Amino acid sequence: MTEPIISFKDFSFQYHSQATPTLQNINVDIYPGEKVLVVGASGSGKSTFANCINGLIPFKTKGNVTGELHINNQDATVSCLHKRSNVVGTVLQDTDGQFIGLTAAEDMAFLLENNCVEQDDMKKNVSYWAEKVDMIEHLNHRPQDLSGGQKQRVSLGGILIHRTPILILDEPLANLDPATGHETLRLLNNIHEETKSTMIIVEHRLEESLDDTFDRVLLFKDGKIIANTTPSDLLKSSKLKEAGIREPLYCTALKYAEVDVESIDNLANLREVCMSEHVKFKVKKWIDKTSSNDDNKYKSEPLLELNEVCVQYSDYSNSVLNNVQLNVYRREMLSIVGHNGAGKSTLAKAICGFLDITGNIQFCNKGFNQLSISERSEFIGYVMQNPNHMISEKMIYDEVALGLRARGMKESDIKIRVENVLKICGLYAFRNWPIAALSYGQKKRVTIASVLVLNPEIIILDEPTAGQDFYHYNEIMSFLIELNRQGKTIIMITHDMHLLSEYSSRTVVLSKGQVVADTTPVLVLNDKKICEIASLRQTSLFEMAEYIGISEPQKLIQLFINHDRKVRRQ
């Protein structure tokens, strides 16, 4: 019988800063060549599990270890980080924490340089993998000029060069646009098939990541593995709901259509599922009997107006934003989508005054260009994509209170507002914690809280749901909906097709610095050309409609959106 390449036996780990173990009594074997998906809510222990395998725990991050862990038949606790890196390659969730070089090419070549590889061979290797991860045109760019998704692809290329027998990817889709994420998963699957490496992917976005190419899924909750099973069996169980993880949209749609999902053999393969005549009949019957009128219209009063706005970085030949014309309406929830590097984050920074622009921005029919960043912050709050770019304080409470203190508010009033927002964002229990002890997703919630507490009229959130499990996703989005009902205008820059379809009244699509679409979410997701231009990926609902033979997929998509909203309101 094949020996496991990774073996946990009665394994527990507790950080020195925590009162209870983050991992509790883990017993699992992973065998050579397996492709395993690790799933769990934010703070469930899945990243800690991965870090125990790659050696960051205990060689960099200290804590109390009990039980046994063997990697490649070696006791994992007596090795060292350098030796472990020859066996385990890791793409971290926080891309800034992994970027070393001054350019993308230099970063990808880091390992080769340390191994004294000849320059000609080094260039060939870097070019080969840069082509694979679609970064060949960005090799000479500095890290600060790359989007979060582009940085992640650079890190992926640098790890793939090493060809380690074990490859770990921690939230690989977190900063990628949907189409690029899909291509990344396809690339990883091809690499897995070609190299027969052991691949562990840590992810909670099952809509994009889960399929029947995975041998197993490990589901974490509160530091324990509550499911160790096949993708199909996991989807048939109630374990995902128990762990606060959202199932793929098509599974939810099947249940709304009263399909008996437990009777489906391979539920993780959508194409096979839709070949069933029973499934086709049930879904079409659901569409025919249910009204799908869109009841979510945005207001017609402009609040923010952008006229021919352009932004150009000094070392880019082309404009990052090119003659952008855009109205943002009072009390709407607007989503802005597009491929990595399309200009989405640049647009937000231009509105907030972080970048010099040409063109004109008006707020409430008054000139906005001449206002300083501080003056604009009275009206507009901005939550950046990377939480590490925003955090200034060491403690959670102090970080959320920072803006209020800068405005001279009384400490007693600050306490009330900060604690209220911390409760809403699921952070109240951690209010006295150091920020360094938080996961990436928890840090993201801290930055959202630090802006929400200031109560601006417009809130811009760059990837608000990145790194969030379904429970905290719903908590944050429910709070944003409530703010919207109170009169706040919400702008969400996102790759999340769930968020786009479920919470947006309008969607603006950017591509190469230009607005290429400005319409409803359903029409965006139903337009193959727009999805291709903007590197969007149509959801599993659209794929379901095509497989079943529904001539107007937008009917199924709109029906699902309306029905799901009603269910969530109950």
UniProtKB/Swiss-Prot annotation:
GO molecular function: ATP binding; ATP hydrolysis activity; ATPase-coupled transmembrane transporter activity
Membrane topology according to the record: Peripheral membrane protein
Binding residues annotated for ATP 1, in chain numbering: G40, A41, S42, G43, S44, G45, K46, S47
Binding residues annotated for ATP 2, in chain numbering: G338, H339, N340, G341, A342, G343, K344, S345
SMART domains in the record: AAA
Subcellular location: Cell membrane
Domain ABC transporter residue range list: 6-247, 304-537
Lineage: superkingdom: Bacteria
EC number(s) per entry: 7.-.-.-
Cellular compartments per GO CC: ATP-binding cassette (ABC) transporter complex
Entry-linked Pfam families: ABC_tran (PF00005), DUF3744 (PF12558)
Keywords, sorted A to Z: ATP-binding, Cell membrane, Membrane, Nucleotide-binding, Repeat, Translocase, Transport
Function (record text): Probably part of an ABC transporter complex. Responsible for energy coupling to the transport system.
Family: Belongs to the ABC transporter superfamily.
Protein name: Putative ABC transporter ATP-binding protein SAR2766
Organism for this UniProt entry: Staphylococcus aureus (strain MRSA252)
